[in-house]
From Swiss-Prot:
<protein>
    <recommendedName>
        <fullName>Phosphoglucosamine mutase</fullName>
        <ecNumber>5.4.2.10</ecNumber>
    </recommendedName>
</protein>
<dbReference type="Pfam" id="PF00408">
    <property type="entry name" value="PGM_PMM_IV"/>
</dbReference>
<dbReference type="GO" id="GO:0009252">
    <property type="term" value="P:peptidoglycan biosynthetic process"/>
</dbReference>
<keyword id="KW-0597">Phosphoprotein</keyword>
<dbReference type="InterPro" id="IPR005844">
    <property type="entry name" value="A-D-PHexomutase_a/b/a-I"/>
</dbReference>
<dbReference type="InterPro" id="IPR050060">
    <property type="entry name" value="Phosphoglucosamine_mutase"/>
</dbReference>
<dbReference type="GO" id="GO:0006048">
    <property type="term" value="P:UDP-N-acetylglucosamine biosynthetic process"/>
</dbReference>
<dbReference type="InterPro" id="IPR005846">
    <property type="entry name" value="A-D-PHexomutase_a/b/a-III"/>
</dbReference>
<dbReference type="InterPro" id="IPR005843">
    <property type="entry name" value="A-D-PHexomutase_C"/>
</dbReference>
<feature type="active site" description="Phosphoserine intermediate">
    <location>
        <position position="100"/>
    </location>
</feature>
<dbReference type="InterPro" id="IPR016066">
    <property type="entry name" value="A-D-PHexomutase_CS"/>
</dbReference>
<keyword id="KW-0413">Isomerase</keyword>
<comment type="similarity">
    <text>Belongs to the phosphohexose mutase family.</text>
</comment>
<dbReference type="InterPro" id="IPR006352">
    <property type="entry name" value="GlmM_bact"/>
</dbReference>
<dbReference type="GO" id="GO:0004615">
    <property type="term" value="F:phosphomannomutase activity"/>
</dbReference>
<feature type="binding site">
    <location>
        <position position="244"/>
    </location>
    <ligand>
        <name>Mg(2+)</name>
    </ligand>
</feature>
<dbReference type="InterPro" id="IPR005845">
    <property type="entry name" value="A-D-PHexomutase_a/b/a-II"/>
</dbReference>
Length: 448
């Protein structure tokens, strides 16, 4: 597979790229690198609903057990629940078997440290080096020193009970429509919202191992949009396969994306004086409408590179409490260490309930400006050369002047392909299309 770890753990087609042999090795090496020398060591492991979940969970579990580490098996459970329970159960680390929003034939393995944070790059590199170099780890315990597997049947209940403590109201009188994506949240989400008093309408709650994300979930918001309209629901919720992100829909059927949810929840937290430093952390791809909406509330938006790990890094470094991505990865750092779809849903619904307004009224506080994204094919070695090209920089300056302060140009070299991504944001969609394609063609002609 070459380099094992990507930006969100290890991913691949299960039993072809991501094999049980590799998972077993990850268990052994993970135990050696993360836990060596720890007394009464234990790890916490959970998975989504993919058919290959059992295969990979069994294999990585065997690796840990062979190193004398106990494994607490949480079963099928959302990714953020693994992060929370790693802390709560005082695990030495946590492991998630999931490929998030990818199709069912894929799977992934992701590690959390003992605090529930993703591993830093240098630790992932250590694990990777051992495996890619086939370095043998001698430690093979025997007898009573072999690790034990412990099944924690009440894992989802512990997570749901914790989430209830993050809000101060109940949801009686609200009708919530949900697309559960045949994923990890298929039991927890409807159960929790019913317990909080909401009327619940659900689809895609029958996982069969192969239907996770299949025409449903957060990458197919049209499913929950239809459900909201048909049932006259107050709020629609659409989760991805491992429930670390959420896309919402308002009472009119309009999409409420990560930017809008951050504006709504951020304003609510700010009014309660619990939005630390009056700041939200977003990525460079977030809509300029978020900046303008938060400015009106006397708040600021700090921008990072694309990726929830960079958002989290900035939040930890500066002590911010709310951050996320347009795609629906929202981090409420006071409550969890990773994007959490179900937690975000509770915070959003609680804001609706406490405000006495509809979600469409609340989302009206932010105007999303049209965004146009065009890829320009360039040679790999030329991906940063646009900054030195006077003609390209002159064209960018001309476009920015034309926008007159209401809009922007963002050029992002791809990390994995010979591409430069051209993103324009402004008031007029048609004009943006012309300008973005023109700029992309210019970049291709000069650097392709």
């Amino acid at each position: 597979m070459g380099k094992l770890f990507g930006t969100d753990g290890i991913r691949g087609i299960a039993n072809e790229e991501l094999t049980p042999e590799l998972a077993y090795q990850l268990g052994r090496v993970g135990a050696y690198v993360l836990i060596k020398g720890a007394k009464d060591a234990k790890v916490v492991i959970g998975r989504d609903t993919r058919i290959s979940g059992d295969l990979l969970t069994s294999a990585i579990t065997s690796g840990f057990l062979s190193m004398g580490v106990d494994v607490i098996d949480l079963g099928v459970i959302p990714t953020p629940a693994v992060a929370y329970l790693t802390r709560e159960l005082q695990g030495n680390c946590g492991i998630v078997i999931s490929a998030s929003h990818n199709p069912a034939e894929y799977n992934g393995i992701k590690f959390f440290n003992h605090q529930g944070y993703k591993l830093p790059d240098e630790i992932e590199e250590q694990i990777e080096t051992y495996i890619l170099n086939n370095e043998e780890i001698e430690n093979r315990v025997t007898g009573a020193a072999v690790g034990k597997r412990i099944e924690l049947k009440e894992a989802t209940r512990l997570y749901m009970d914790y989430l209830k403590t993050t809000i101060e109201c109940r949801f009686e009188g609200l009708k919530i429509a949900m697309d559960l994506g045949n994923g990890a949240v298929y039991e927890a989400a409807p159960q929790l919202l019913k317990e909080l008093g909401a009327e619940v309408i659900i689809v895609n709650d029958q996982p069969d191992g192969m239907n996770i994300n299949e025409g449903c979930g957060s990458t197919h918001p049209e499913v929950v949009q239809r459900l909201v309209k048909e049932n006259k629901a107050d709020v629609g919720l659409s989760f991805d396969g491992d429930a670390d992100r959420l896309i919402a829909v308002d009472n009119t059927g309009a999409i409420v994306d990560g930017d809008s949810m951050m504006a709504i929840c951020g304003t609510n937290l700010n009014e309660k004086h619990i939005l630390n430093k009056n700041t939200i952390v977003a990525t460079v791809m977030s809509n300029i409408g978020l900046d303008l909406a938060m400015k009106e509330q006397g708040c600021q938006v700090v921008k990072t590179k694309v990726g929830d790990r960079y958002v989290l890094e900035e939040m930890i470094k500066e002590g911010y409490t709310l951050g996320g991505e347009q795609s629906g990865h929202i981090i409420f750092l006071k409550y969890n260490t990773t994007g959490d779809g179900l937690l975000t849903a509770l915070q959003l619904i609680a804001t609706v309930k406490e405000s006495g307004k509809t979600l469409s009224e609340l989302s009206g506080m932010m105007t999303s400006y049209p965004q146009v994204l065009v890829n320009a094919k360039v040679k790999n070695e030329n991906k940063l050369a646009y900054m030195e090209d006077e003609v390209i920089m002159g064209e960018i300056k001309m476009i920015e002047e034309k926008m007159n302060g209401v809009g922007r140009v963002l050029i992002r070299p791809s990390g994995t392909e010979p591409l430069v991504r051209v993103m324009l944001e402004g008031q007029e969609q048609a004009e943006l299309e012309v300008l973005a394609h023109g700029l992309a063609q210019l970049i291709e002609s000069k650097l392709g």
